[in-house]
């Protein structure tokens, strides 16, 4: 595993993080997760997730033949604030043991292939995922080991869309790695 998480210092010697703000040309990003990439849990890590050629090979592979194949779901999704497991310890100090990260998403293309995929996820929802939002891709070379649940939601109203409602969750002290999306 090649996670690229920050190195946390021991003791009270930690320095303040470095920030960057531009009063004249702020770098802001819009919301919405619009695609989730999914691979079998046993699939091999990507060699370099920032390279389009690496993604092209994995996306072209047949998932019925290799666990290294990556598929994607077009979604309307969000990643709300992670839920932190904060514990108070001696001398009125606090630590974060872990965070529970969640992606809530809807799949609005509910054809037979996507319905079969929903049913396959119900066999056991542990996968490696990456997600894209705006100009960024999240997940690193390893992907995010996440548990996915998906449900078919048929509305009462005739003019409403039938959607698959999904939730992906994982535990991590850190938010996932982020990179400019090479597929845009």
Ranges and model annotations:
Residues 2-102, 144-159:
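Solvent-exposed edge beta-strands and adjacent loop segments
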Residues 115-139:
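Short, acidic/charged, Gly/Pro-enriched secondary-structure junctions
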Residues 90-112, 159-175:
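Oligomerization/assembly interface segments of phage tail-like spikes and tubes
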Residues 138-184:
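Mixed-charge, glycine-accented linear interaction segment located at domain edges/termini
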Residues 19-21, 105, 127, 147, ...:
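Phenylalanine-focused residue identity feature
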Residues 24, 41, 108-112, 132-134, ...:
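Generic structural motif
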Residues 112-115, 152-153:
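Short alpha-helical segments and helix-capping/turn motifs at coil-helix boundaries
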